[in-house]
Regions:
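Conserved alpha-helical "signature site"
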Residues: 108-288, 292-366
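Alpha4 helix (beta4-alpha4-beta5 surface) of REC/receiver domains from two-component response regulators
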Residues: 65, 78, 85-102, 109
Length: 396
C-alpha cells in the first residue's frame, strides 16, 4: 500500500510546479494537490494522510493554523511547512504544530528526501497508539528551576547570548525545540547546528525570549504528574551522559562537529522516557518501579506495554523535528547500536558506551554491545574509555 502525501498551496503555479517535480514519485506515493486549507481538511476527513506539506501564507486559514488543526484531528500525520516567508510571528505560531520547515522555492530532491525520511521514521514505529502520542507532542518537559532561571536571566539587561546558551544546554526540552527551530529551512543555514549555545547565538535573544515566554516551545513540569519518574534525575543522568559522550569523541577523534553531536545526543538520549511518563504516568511509573535494576528489563517492559521502547519513541520524535541524522540515530539506537550500518566511531558509539559506563558506575561492569564494538574494532578500547570517564585525573 502506497503512502498518501497531501500538498496544499493557494498559488496555482506553485501547485502545478509541485505536481511536475514530484511526478517521479507516483509509483511510491499516492499524491493529492489542493489549493486551500478547507479542501485539505475535507480530504483528510475521508482519506488517511501520512504526510501533509502546506504553504504558510494562505487566505482564510494559513498553514500554521491548518497544521494546528491537523495535529488535533490527525496526530499521526507528519506535518511539513513550505514557505518563502521567514516571518518571526508565523514561525513562532507554527513551532508547536509543525514537524519540519522547508523554504520556498524548495529543491525537489530536498523535498522528496524530507518526505521519504518522515515515512521511514513512521515505518519504524508501527504502533498506532505511540504514533498518535508522538504526533501530539508539542514539547518535552523542562525542569522548573531551569525554566525559572532562564526567564529571570532574560529580564536582566546584562544577560548575554552565551549565558542563555549555557542554561539551555542543561535542559532537554529547551535544547530539542531550539535545535528544531534553528535547523529549519527558514534560517537558511548551510549546515546543521548541533550545539545549543551556537543555536541561541544564531537565533538571537529576542527570538529566544519569545519562544520561552510565550510557552510555544516549553512548559514547566508538574512534580506530582508521575509517581516514579523524576525529570530532575533524568536531567542529571542526561547531562552526565552528554559530557561523557563528548569526552569520548574528543579522545578518539577530536572532531568538533561530532563532539557537539555527541553532546546533544547524550542530552536527549532518554527523551523518549518523557513522552511515555507524561502520557502514561501511572502505567510508566509502575514499569519504572519494577525494572529499577536492569535497563534490559525496562526495554522489554516498555515493548510489552507500548509496542516500542523509549529509544524508539525518542528517535522518532526528534527525527520528525529534523534534528541531524547522527543525533537521531544515536538516540534511537543507543541500546541497539549494532542495527546501524556505520562501521566507524560515531556519536552513537559515544552515547552507547558513555551510557553503559555511567549506568555501571565505578564498581560495576558496563553492559555494552560487544559484537558492535568488535565490528568497529574498538573492543580493546573499553577499559581505557572507562578509565577516562570514571578517573579523568589518572587517564592518559
Amino acid at each position: 500500500m502506497k503512502n498518501q502525501v497531501l500538498f496544499v498551496d493557494d498559488e496555482a503555479l506553485i501547485l502545478q510546479g509541485l505536481q511536475r517535480s514530484m511526478r517521479g514519485m507516483r509509483n511510491e506515493w499516492d499524491m493529492t494537490f489542493v489549493d486551500n486549507a478547507a479542501a485539505a481538511l475535507a480530504f483528510m476527513a475521508t482519506h488517511p494522510v501520512d504526510v501533509i506539506v502546506s504553504d504558510m501564507r494562505m487566505p482564510a486559514m494559513n498553514g500554521a493554523q491548518l497544521l494546528g488543526e491537523v495535529m488535533k484531528r490527525y496526530p499521526r500525520t507528519v506535518r511539513l511547512i513550505l514557505s518563502g516567508h521567514a516571518d518571526q510571528d508565523l514561525i513562532l505560531q507554527c513551532v508547536g504544530s509543525t514537524h519540519q520547515f522547508l523554504s520556498k522555492p524548495c529543491d525537489p530532491e530536498q523535498l522528496r528526501a524530507t518526505v521519504c525520511r518522515a515515512m521511514d521514521l513512521e515505518s519504524k514505529l508501527k504502533n498506532e497508539r505511540l504514533q498518535q502520542l508522538v504526533g501530539r507532542m508539542e514539547h518535552l518537559p523542562s525542569v522548573p528551576s531551569l525554566y525559572s532561571e532562564i526567564v529571570d536571566r532574560m529580564h536582566d539587561p546584562e544577560t548575554t547570548l552565551e549565558d542563555i546558551g549555557v542554561i539551555i544546554a542543561k535542559d532537554i526540552g529547551m535544547t530539542a525545540k531550539i535545535l528544531k527551530l534553528v535547523n529549519s529551512a527558514f534560517f537558511g543555514l548551510r549546515r546543521q547546528v548541533a550545539s545549543p549555545a551556537e543555536a541561541v547565538a544564531y537565533l538571537g535573544l529576542d527570538t529566544i525570549k519569545s519562544l520561552v515566554l510565550s510557552m510555544h516551545a516549553f512548559s514547566q513540569f508538574e512534580p506530582d504528574q508521575t509517581n516514579a519518574f523524576s525529570i530532575s534525575r533524568l536531567w542529571d543522568h542526561s547531562m552526565q551522559t552528554a559530557a561523557a559522550a563528548k569526552r569520548l569523541v574528543q579522545v578518539e577523534l577530536n572532531d568538533r562537529k561530532m563532539m557537539d553531536e555527541a553532546f546533544v545526543s547524550g542530552l536527549l538520549h532518554d527523551a523518549g522516557k518523557t513522552a511515555l511518563a507524561f502520557n502514561f504516568p501511572d502505567q510508566y511509573g509502575k514499569i519504572l518501579e519494577q525494572t529499577r535494576a536492569s535497563s534490559a528489563d525496562l526495554l522489554r517492559a516498555e515493548l510489552e506495554a507500548f509496542g516500542a521502547n523509549h529509544a524508539d519513541v525518542g528517535g522518532y520524535l526528534l527525527g520528525l523535528w529534523g534534528l541531524p541524522t547522527p543525533v537521531v540515530e544515536a538516540i534511537a539506537l543507543h541500546h541497539q547500536p549494532a542495527l546501524t550500518s556505520a562501521n566507524t566511531f560515531t556519536p552513537l558509539t559515544a552515547v552507547h558506551v558513555a551510557n553503559a559506563i555511567l549506568n555501571a558506575g565505578p564498581a560495576g561492569t558496563p553492559v555494552v554491545d560487544a559484537v558492535y564494538l568488535e565490528r568497529l574494532k574498538l573492543a580493546d578500547r573499553l577499559n581505557g574509555w572507562r578509565e577516562t570517564l570514571l578517573n579523568p585525573a589518572t587517564a592518559e
